[in-house]
Amino acid sequence: MDSNKRPDTMERITTPELAESFIAEQIAAVREQVGDKKVLLALSGGVDSSVVAALLIKAIGKQLVCVHVNHGLMRKGESEQVIEVFGKELDANLVYIDATDRFLDKLAGVAEPEKKRKIIGEEFVRVFEEESGKLEGISFLAQGTIYPDILESDGVKAHHNVGGLPEDFKFEGLVEPVKLLYKDEVRVVGKALGLPAEMVDRQPFPGPGLGVRCTGAITRDRLHALRESDAILREEFDKAGLTSQIWQFFTVVPDITSTGVKDGKRLDYWPVIIRAVNTVDAMHCTVPRIDWEILEKITNRILNEVDGVCRVCYDMSPKPIATIEWE
């Protein structure tokens, strides 16, 4: 039987009871697979790796070594949440790497989107490789592979969930407890494992993080404005009950300035663009109609609370022709 093929008889996980049954099965399977050996996991804080981490902690405890690399392009509070949930609440064997300076120094002056993506991906591999090399006795690699990953690669998973490991990075085997699950099932399992809703229901987030929303060459001050404006948007959408109604939303701070005025003086500050979309397949997206009072409140907060910003815009572009992300 192909271990990468979901059995036709496998019931869709839609309830806490089905999730608990799945968790029990996977705990037994993982214990049988790894025995008393150590397992390594790159923990991004995303849905898939977080659910795998929580499940493996339940199965093998301190035998799991989680490595979280903060590349400086995370949303506000995300790395702190990983430390709080996994390092403190779940008492995980967590290795936290703050590589912010390393990544931002590499990205300095780089404006071309694909080049930025490549630098971020390659640097992640180097950091993960260096830190993993310091660990002893690692026998298995765990990954947050899910079933759509397998389907999209015609049943042959490239296993690049940790950024693309070098060919000479040898393990006895891969531990992929959620590889036959769809995304909605992974979320149900995550909730059954007790992970916080904001982590389990996390929106899609590009691999390069905020690097593709801070368009052009990334600067620390503009990245700060992006992170703060994004946090305000999320907070206000949450208060308005929009978080569960909109598929994805975020802010963008482009590499341009706009003329503003304050205390009678001209300013050359950045614009902030609000992007919100609804979609079923991510191929065709519509832009939701947001209540004017909500947009006005978000605008006022961003202009008053975020340094260096003088203008807020709402992106009305559907896909196609515009992509969801700006880069």
Regions found by a protein language model. Give the residues of each.
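Extended catalytic-interface subdomain
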Residues: 143-145
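RNA-binding accessory domains that recognize and position tRNA/RNA substrates
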Residues: 1-139, 148, 154-327
